[in-house]
């Protein structure tokens, strides 16, 4: 019986070694699949990100042109108003200076009102 026990024990040890190899291969395969899945997910994320960035740039380009035109129009209006104000200032400059000098150098006695 000793030989049978020894053969049985040896058979169990061989089966255990074989099971260990199978488990190890399964772990390696699972690890490999997890890495592959992670890499695939990264690629999908990058592709999605690139697509959304392209869509955003297209949207931005379409809408920036309208804003740019409005901004240019506003700038033109502002410059026109500035020119008008400068022209009005230049036109009345002499009279304003005369009035200021007259007011400063010509005393006019006025009674101080009690507050």
Curated annotation (Swiss-Prot):
GO CC field: vacuolar proton-transporting V-type ATPase, V1 domain
Organism: Neurospora crassa (strain ATCC 24698 / 74-OR23-1A / CBS 708.71 / DSM 1257 / FGSC 987)
Protein name listed in UniProt: V-type proton ATPase subunit G
First-listed, main subcellular location of the protein, grouped into a coarse class: membrane
Pfam families in the cross-refs: V-ATPase_G (PF03179)
Subcellular location: Vacuole membrane
Region forming the signal peptide: none
Oligomeric form and interacting partners: V-ATPase is a heteromultimeric enzyme composed of a peripheral catalytic V1 complex (components A to H) attached to an integral membrane V0 proton pore complex (components: a, c, c', c'', d, e, f and VOA1).
């Amino acid at each position: 019986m000793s030989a049978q026990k020894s053969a049985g024990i040896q058979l169990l040890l061989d089966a255990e070694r074989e099971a260990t190899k199978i488990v190890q291969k399964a772990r390696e395969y699972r690890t490999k699949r997890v890495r592959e899945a992670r890499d695939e997910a990264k690629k999908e994320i990058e592709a999605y990100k690139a697509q959304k960035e392209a869509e955003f740039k297209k949207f931005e380009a379409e809408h920036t042109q309208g804003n740019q035109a409005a901004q240019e129009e506003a700038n033109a209006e502002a410059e026109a108003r500035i020119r008008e104000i400068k022209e009005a200032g230049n036109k009345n400059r002499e009279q304003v200076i005369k009035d200021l000098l007259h007011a400063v150098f010509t005393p006019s006695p006025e009674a101080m009102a009690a507050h």
